[in-house]
């Protein structure tokens, strides 16, 4: 195990379920699909922001990196559960960086994560 790639994670993906209000499928986060990731990743802090005085809110941002040569089926609609139990939301589409010498391969994946309190 590398010093920087030391976090075990599980991808949480919402199940699709019927809505009582329409015929469209909706996300069900009460019972998400848990997808274990078979290799450790790096989770690094990116900073935080605080809301105004009228609403106490803190948004903490993190960056996820996979080891070189590892692709990850992570979607913008997913969440990530850390081994500590913390659940972070994926913020935007994950970036699948191409390998510089193997055009058909992914070098690594980067994703922005965040958690909002308040």
Regions found by a protein language model. Give the residues of each.
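Active-site-proximal polar cores
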Residues: 1-26
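Short, conserved turn/kink motifs that form compact alpha/beta structural patches or helix kinks used as
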Residues: 24-118
